[in-house]
Amino acid sequence: MANERNQQNLTSLRGSLTGVETFYVVDYQGLTAGQLSQLRKNIREKGGQLIVAKNTLINLALQESGRDFSDALKGPSALVLAQEDPAGVAKALSDAAKGNDKGIPAIKGGFVEGNRVDVRVVERLASLGSKQSLQGELVGVLSAHLSNFVGILEAYRDKLGGGAAEAQG
């Protein structure tokens, strides 16, 4: 572990994990170089990052930040960081797994907003949709309620204004 390359990789991993509240551990074995490259691109578009490193280095970096994933780091593993859109990154992983007959990448577990989660939680998160689509839905719901509220206020204003106009006439 003491070789210089491992030390550099560990330092890089530590830096990448700084401030990250959501990440996923995935099995990527069986993906072709082209599929892995496409997966990296899709994850990057969602504001995430896919890191392939030795399990020992990933485990050390995670343990130093108080997160133990030694049980999930068996076999070829990659760390997928989700800085901006955790649901979007989870969906990119899910879509990639559905896009091939092997179901790869296979999610082994994750850490979402400070809590360790299992595969089922990550799959549910992936089904939510991206942050942008959820924000769009929220804006739609809020604007509908605000429109109704404005309609009520206008009706009440007309009722009050109509009574005052009749008294003056």
From Swiss-Prot:
Keywords: Ribonucleoprotein, Ribosomal protein, RNA-binding, rRNA-binding. InterPro entries: Ribosomal_uL10 (IPR001790), Ribosomal_uL10-like_sf (IPR043141), Ribosomal_uL10_bac (IPR022973), Ribosomal_uL10_bac_type (IPR047865), Ribosomal_uL10_CS_bac (IPR002363). Gene3D superfamilies: 3.30.70.1730. One of its GO terms (biological process) is translation. One of its GO terms (cellular component) is large ribosomal subunit. It comes from the Bacteria. Signal peptide: none annotated. GO terms for molecular function: large ribosomal subunit rRNA binding; structural constituent of ribosome. Transmembrane segments: none annotated. Belongs to the universal ribosomal protein uL10 family. Forms part of the ribosomal stalk, playing a central role in the interaction of the ribosome with GTP-bound translation factors. HAMAP family: Ribosomal_uL10. Part of the ribosomal stalk of the 50S ribosomal subunit. The N-terminus interacts with L11 and the large rRNA to form the base of the stalk. The C-terminus forms an elongated spine to which L12 dimers bind in a sequential fashion forming a multimeric L10(L12)X complex. This is Large ribosomal subunit protein uL10. The gene is rplJ.
